[in-house]
Amino acid sequence: PKEKREAKLSYDPVGWHNYKFYYGDGSKEAWLMNRGHLVGYQFSGLTDEGRNLVPMTAWLNTGAFTGTDDKNQSSMLYYENGLDSWLANHPNYYLDYKVTAVYKDNELIPRQIILQYVGIDQDGNLLEIKLGSSKEKIDKYSVTHVALDNVSANAEINYADGTAKNT
């Protein structure tokens, strides 16, 4: 997308609750949850779109309790930035990218986010993409699979109803 995305999201995904919890040594507070994009704005252009938003911990979404840490391999941001760089470095190639929220039974909050990605060259050949994460597993078709847990070290999450307790 050429336009900057909206600064604030207003859509509340199913199961949405938010809590300001203490973290670290207990002297700082941060919001536990984000309205997390399954497919990042830089790839989809979707911002406040319900079909693309789920409750994600800030840790899963941005890699940090506050701010961002795109070096955190347990975060969506690590893979989104890595894939965005891969596309920038391969302007004549395509990215096939699938993101799946994984729920157990009738839970409202996803327990995991599964990423699958592969490059495609001008001739339609599949190209392995390895971003350097220990979480990446590549299958026989060159598709990379990553499973990310929707957790936070400072919280116990009730995935069935979206509530949480500070730990």
Language model feature labels by segment:
Residues P1-T167:
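Domain-level detector of nuclease and nuclease-like folds
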